[in-house]
């Protein structure tokens, strides 16, 4: 076995391992070895390569890699196809910035074709960084044969899906109000909008709408979007709600009865009460009269009006609200549009023409105040949608869009979701399920350039539509020969004209591209160019057994996958969804570059290694929980887990090489109870880890492994060191080597999905084989010994209590103590005699015994809990307190047992004192200190005699010399002669313990003499010791 370089950096080790993997094609072999096995399917959510990875990507890639590696090791064939999301507005915006242009007008001036080419060139700007990041973090995914959403085969599959949806009558062109980004100048779908809500404070206004032909009488309407008021065409009331006419300061106001107090506040007189339906058709004077409104400016009835907020009257601007649009359509009212595609007022509002509407709320309110039409204004905090791509506030515009009738198959969506297992479970019928319940038809079209062209051709003569499902289908209907290498992007497909089969007229393609979420939602099919190729492969790889992405994909990719599959096949595209929580900074704030609190995962890997980063992300908390994260978290994972494991592995290799131990040879072995215990722990942990991983409980699995590694390092190896240090090879020493070898090899397999680099390093060095080509460990039931594990756990508890006891009294473990007494509080069949030597050695005590009668070593004190007892006993509280203090120990013991006592106060009244009235404090016998965990109490004799003190000094000297040997890098088996120069008192102490020193320090001869300043010096508290070592071999 190669010597372990414990000083090798994590990134150095991982680079070396990656090189091995590449040279030996380990990733490819891991898949080939499962050829013919049952498939386990996961889908890679496609990132965009025009932005750099962040810590959230590290979490997602870690989880997916753990799943894929684990499932491979338990026998499945797991294909791992990478993907790239290459279309969409972020790409266009990046190119605009690069070219120094902005907006559609300048794009079209620049030229659509060159612009599209620039987009194509830019999408892989950071591909190299993504590939390096993916490899450095140990995520095994096929990046040499990815699916790419801009490629013709992918787009052709998307066209087949859209053509099928059109064929089903579910794709239609409609005029409706949709969320619109004036900055990007395109509409958005409802699931895109759901990703971008922010809490903002906007100026709200309560507006006076003067009743026509009535003096000083006004309807009061409240709005949080004053900018929509110039487009007002009606006021809406609920027909069954009660409204009042109330007089205030000479004016009469009409407002919902339930809202009058909140709106008018005070000093008003209710004149009359009316049903909403009585107010219908009442005309009013609009604050911004428009001659285009030939049917409007009167009250209408609408069921969506409530009295939850505002005035109970809703101002209706049909161009900018979904409910408004619907009710105006049904009422046949005029339609008014006063805003252009850039979100600026048109000449319809002359005094604000060319201004961005969201910046004009103050101007509108000032105008209303000037005209005497403002009743009240205030800042109003509410949730408002923003563009998920550019962060601009959205507007709601009425316009023509292509929509998919998702509402027509809503039941299919809901049924498919019911078949899915969600992690966490509450997402299923919570965040995701509620979104499905409230779905609207999917606005699929975007008035942009760089995207999958919507494959619908419309006849200029008869409006007939044709939706080709393939390139061949398009060629077949084309009016002229199309190029063999036709690229399925604007402007190339726009040049293809089709002959209308209905009237013989010319059909041209509708100019829109599609929602990029439809692109990525089509990947189960399009990644294999289905249905044109790979039908068997597709059927083998559909649906996914699991997908895993960030929680922000709930209304993104998770939804689009479900929607596309339901529309196309009627089936759910996945069986399980792992919805991963946000990775926050250590203060619980969302990470962002602008705040300066973002962690770069590439930097973290460089500093601490990928294993440490992966382990930190997994062991901290369940991946679907939001987690606070920092460099400290990763450093802790490295030191507590990765480095601990490497130290154990290094220890084994060092001594096995010294003893020329060969795990492939047969030795006479005699396993100790400690060996049996660690093997039982190994296999019980294996059982728990497999159960956890089968249920995707990664954190539970990681914590089980962490506990095992800690116990192997800090208990098994430490308790076995003397066996490894013995000269020669006896049966117990061979058993220690055999056991630790088995433990390390099995642990390397257990951790292979979690920390693949250190797992590989250990396994290759100990066995010669890649751990990633091995099967996952299975439980050997014959090695499980629950009783032994329980007993050793009890020993560990007692040792931990003893250490805590020593710490409380600043007594180092190197300082021997005379006695340890163990008090047991629960009956059990623990055979402490079998573990006497371990406890005594671990806690460095001369005697140890178990005591059942705790009164020999402890007494109790009762103190009144005044917070509880004061109100209960009132004026008698001080008398009760005095009585408690003078109780005998027998009476105190009785109270502790019964938790009840009766005391007669001076007045003759009896008061009952119970456990909740009293605080019970356990006091150790004089000269002893105690620590307890409820099950055990450890009593230590803290009196240190001169003899014990001297032995403690000798043991502290042993520690100092062992540390000194490490600093000199002396071989661990090198025997030395020691010359010491120190004061006489310390010389005598060390002489008295010469055999103890020789036994622990591999010393052949101790002498005392004069050493010069050139020799090294050790410190033992205040005492200095000069020392010189020389080889005695």
Curated annotation (Swiss-Prot):
The keyword Protein biosynthesis applies. Monomer. This is Isoleucine--tRNA ligase. Its EC number is 6.1.1.5. NCBIfam families: ileS. It catalyses: tRNA(Ile) + L-isoleucine + ATP = L-isoleucyl-tRNA(Ile) + AMP + diphosphate. Belongs to the class-I aminoacyl-tRNA synthetase family. IleS type 2 subfamily. The lineage of its organism: Bacteria, Bacillati, Bacillota, Bacilli, Bacillales. It is found in: Cytoplasm. A motif ('HIGH' region) lies at residues 47-57. One of its GO terms (cellular component) is cytoplasm. ATP binds at residue 593. IleRS has two distinct active sites: one for aminoacylation and one for editing. The misactivated valine is translocated from the active site to the editing site, which sterically excludes the correctly activated isoleucine. The single editing site contains two valyl binding pockets, one specific for each substrate (Val-AMP or Val-tRNA(Ile)). Its cofactor is Zn(2+).
């Amino acid at each position: 076995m190669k010597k372990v370089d414990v000083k090798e950096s994590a990134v150095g080790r991982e680079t070396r391992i990656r090189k091995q993997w590449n040279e030996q094609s380990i990733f490819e072999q891991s898949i080939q070895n499962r050829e013919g096995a049952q498939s386990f399917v996961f889908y890679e959510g496609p990132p965009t390569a025009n932005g750099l990875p962040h810590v959230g990507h590290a979490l997602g890639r870690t989880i997916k890699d753990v799943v894929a590696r684990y499932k491979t090791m338990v026998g499945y064939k797991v294909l791992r196809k990478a993907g790239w999301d290459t279309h969409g507005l972020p790409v266009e915006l990046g190119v605009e910035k690069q070219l120094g242009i902005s907006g559609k007008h300048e794009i079209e001036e620049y030229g659509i074709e060159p612009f599209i080419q620039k987009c194509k060139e830019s999408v892989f700007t950071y591909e190299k960084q993504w590939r390096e990041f993916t490899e450095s973090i140990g995520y095994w995914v096929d990046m040499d044969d990815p699916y790419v959403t801009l490629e013709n085969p992918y787009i052709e599959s998307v066209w087949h899906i859209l053509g099928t949806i059109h064929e089903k009558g579910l794709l239609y062109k409609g005029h409706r109000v949709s969320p619109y980004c004036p900055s990007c100048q395109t509409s958005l779908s409802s699931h895109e909008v759901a990703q971008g809500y922010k809490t903002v404070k906007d100026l709200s206004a309560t507006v006076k709408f003067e009743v026509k032909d009535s003096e000083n009488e006004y309807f009061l309407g409240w709005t949080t979007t004053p900018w929509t008021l110039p487009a007002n065409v009606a006021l809406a009331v609920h027909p069954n709600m009660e409204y009042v006419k109330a007089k205030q300061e000479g004016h009469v106001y009409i407002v919902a009865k339930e809202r009058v107090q909140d709106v008018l506040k005070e000093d008003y007189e209710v004149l009359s009460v009316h049903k909403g339906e009585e107010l219908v058709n009442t005309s009013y004077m609009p604050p911004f009269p428009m001659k285009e409104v030939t049917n409007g400016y009167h009250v209408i009835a609408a069921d969506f009006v409530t009295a939850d907020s505002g005035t109970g009257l809703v101002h209706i601007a049909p161009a900018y609200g979904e409910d408004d649009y619907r009710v105006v359509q049904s009422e046949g009212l005029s339609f008014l549009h006063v805003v252009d595609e850039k979100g600026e007022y048109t000449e319809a509002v002359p005094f604000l023409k060319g201004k961005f509407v969201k910046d004009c709320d103050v101007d509108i309110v000032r105008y209303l105040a000037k005209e005497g039409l403002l009743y009240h204004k205030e800042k109003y905090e509410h949730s408002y949608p923003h563009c998920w791509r550019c962060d601009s506030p959205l507007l709601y515009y009425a316009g023509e869009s292509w929509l998919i009738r998702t509402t027509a198959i809503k039941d299919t969506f809901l049924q498919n979701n019911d078949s899915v297992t969600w992690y966490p479970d509450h997402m299923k019928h919570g965040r995701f399920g509620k979104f499905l319940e409230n779905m609207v038809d999917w606005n699929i079209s975007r008035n942009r350039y760089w995207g999958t062209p919507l494959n619908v051709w419309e006849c200029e003569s008869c409006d007939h539509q044709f939706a080709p499902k393939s390139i061949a289908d398009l060629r077949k209907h084309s009016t002229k020969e199309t190029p063999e290498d036709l690229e399925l992007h604007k402007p190339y497909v726009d040049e293809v004209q089709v002959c209308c089969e209905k009237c013989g007229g010319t059909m041209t393609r509708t100019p829109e591209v599609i929602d990029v979420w439809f692109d990525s939602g089509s990947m189960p099919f399009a990644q294999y160019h289905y249905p044109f190729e790979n039908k068997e492969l597709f059927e083998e790889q559909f649906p996914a057994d699991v997908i895993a992405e960030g929680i922000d994909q709930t209304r993104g990719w998770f939804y689009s996958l479900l929607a596309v599959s339901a529309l196309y096949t009627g089936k759910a595209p996945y069986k399980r969804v792992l919805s991963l929580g946000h990775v926050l900074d250590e203060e619980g704030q969302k990470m962002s570059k602008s705040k300066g609190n973002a962690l770069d995962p590439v930097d973290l890997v460089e500093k601490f290694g990928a294993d440490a980063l992966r382990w930190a992300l997994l062991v901290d908390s369940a991946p679907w929980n939001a987690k606070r994260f920092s460099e400290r978290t990763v450093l802790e994972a490295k030191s507590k887990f990765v480095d601990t494991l490497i130290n154990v592995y290094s220890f084994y290799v060092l001594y096995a090489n010294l003893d020329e131990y060969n795990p492939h040879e047969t030795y006479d072995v005699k396993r100790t109870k400690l060996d049996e215990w660690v093997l039982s722990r190994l296999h019980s942990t294996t059982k728990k880890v497999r159960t956890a991983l089968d249920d995707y409980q990664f954190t539970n699995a990681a914590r089980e492994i962490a506990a095992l590694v800690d116990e192997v390092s800090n208990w098994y190896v430490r308790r076995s060191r003397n066996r490894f240090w013995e000269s020669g090879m006896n049966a117990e020493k061979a058993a220690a080597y055999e056991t630790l070898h088995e433990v390390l090899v099995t642990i390397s397999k257990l951790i292979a999905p979690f920390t693949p680099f250190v797992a590989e390093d250990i396994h290759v060095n100990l066995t010669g084989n890649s751990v990633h080509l091995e099967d996952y460990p299975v439980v050997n039931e014959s090695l499980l010994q629950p009783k032994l594990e329980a007993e050793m756990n009890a020993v560990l508890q007692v040792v931990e209590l003893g250490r805590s006891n020593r710490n409380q009294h600043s007594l180092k473990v190197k300082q021997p103590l005379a006695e340890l007494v163990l008090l047991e509080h629960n009956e059990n069949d623990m055979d402490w005699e079998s573990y006497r030597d371990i406890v005594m050695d671990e806690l460095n005590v001369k005697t140890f015994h178990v005591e059942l009668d705790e009164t020999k070593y402890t007494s109790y004190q009762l103190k009144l809990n005044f917070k509880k007892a004061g109100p209960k006993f009132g004026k008698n509280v001080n008398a009760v307190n005095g009585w408690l203090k003078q109780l005998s120990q027998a009476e105190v013991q009785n109270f502790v047992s019964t938790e009840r006592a009766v005391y007669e106060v001076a007045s003759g009244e009896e008061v009952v004192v119970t456990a909740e009235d009293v605080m019970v404090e356990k006091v150790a016998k004089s000269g002893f200190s105690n620590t307890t965990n409820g099950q055990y109490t450890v009593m230590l004799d803290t009196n240190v005699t001169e003899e014990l003190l001297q032995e403690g000094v000798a043991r502290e000297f042993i520690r100092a010399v062992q540390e000194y040997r490490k600093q000199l890098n002396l071989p661990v088996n090198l025997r030395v002669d020691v010359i010491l120069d120190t004061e006489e008192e310390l010389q005598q102490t060390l002489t008295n313990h010469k055999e103890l020193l020789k036994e622990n320090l591999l010393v052949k001869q101790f002498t005392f003499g004069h050493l010069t300043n050139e020799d090294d010096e050790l410190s033992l508290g205040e005492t200095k010791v000069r020392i010189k070592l020389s080889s005695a071999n």
